[in-house]
A protein has these predicted regions:
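Short acidic/His/Gly/Ser-rich catalytic and metal-binding motifs that mark active-site loops
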Residues: 54, 144-148, 190-191
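Short, glycine-/aromatic-enriched active-site segment of Class I SAM-dependent methyltransferases
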Residues: 137-160
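Conserved N-terminal segment of class I S-adenosyl-L-methionine
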Residues: 1-107, 116-123, 184, 224-227
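A short His-aromatic
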Residues: 111-113
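A C-terminal cap/extension of S-adenosyl-L-methionine-dependent methyltransferases
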Residues: 169, 180-235
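Short glycine-dipeptide loop
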Residues: 129-135
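Short alpha-helix
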Residues: 159-175
């Protein structure tokens, strides 16, 4: 991944500071339900960028969180806000921190890596976790017929799409068990009236798509633009 490096977060808006509020709402809706209740859990955020997820975790009371990003200018934004953003590349960092974390979360989509790189990355995450630890990942969802092809073709650093099934396969190849895919929610901004319109329209479309898939003998549960998964390392 050269145009959008996997270990550097690229999705920050032009108003980087303004992004903290929006991304915090997104992360709280999508990630907090999958985190341990223990606020002292050791959490590593890979490709943390300016620290949006770190900020959301801090607001939720998690006190033992560190983020890494390969771009010093992005990490500096979080550092100025008192967030534990370090400048580091993902693969060598994980190699030198084995068995240290309860949770690892990459903020970048897995599909910015090739299949082989993804499996290697997941194995490194597996080794960096404590027994019973978990990883929370996401990638572009190829099961959605409206955006799946565009997701893959959007830039040359998107090497593949996944479905809930193939994302599970990748995590299993990385050594993980108890893989639980979930839909990443886009419409979580409840003060915006258009949020409700988008939620209603996409919910109806996904219901129709599920029915069509059933006619073809396919049982597809996750049809959101992006599909996430939480997976555990054996105890």
């Amino acid at each position: 991944a050269r145009l959008e490096p996997f270990d550097s977060y690229w999705q920050a808006p032009k108003d980087v500071e303004g992004g903290f509020k929006a991304f915090t709402a997104y992360y709280k809706a999508n990630y907090l339900p999958h985190l341990p209740e223990d606020r002292e859990a050791r959490i590593l955020v890979v490709s943390c960028g300016p620290g949006y997820l770190l900020n959301a975790l801090a607001e939720a009371g998690y006190r033992n969180v560190v983020g890494i990003d390969s771009d010093p200018s992005k990490a500096a934004v979080g550092q100025k806000r008192g967030l534990a953003c370090e400048v580091a590349e993902a693969f060598p960092y994980l190699e030198h921190h084995r068995g240290e974390y309860d949770v690892i979360i990459p903020e970048q989509e897995l599909n910015h890596l090739t299949i082989d790189e993804t499996i290697e990355f997941l194995r490194l995450c597996h080794d960096a976790l404590k027994p019973g630890g978990r990883v929370i990942v996401y990638a572009m969802n190829g099961a959605n017929p409206f955006v799946g092809s565009e997701n893959l073709s959007h830039n040359i650093d998107h090497f593949y799409n996944v479905t809930e099934y193939s994302l599970t396969q990748l995590l299993q190849l990385g050594g993980f068990t108890d893989v639980r895919p979930f839909a990443l929610k886009l419409y979580v901004f409840w003060k915006n009236p258009l949020n409700y319109v988008g939620l209603a329209v996409t919910s109806l479309l996904e219901l129709a798509m599920r029915a069509i898939f059933m006619l073809y003998g396919k049982k597809v549960r996750v049809l959101s633009k992006k599909v996430g998964a939480v997976a555990r390392k054996g105890a």
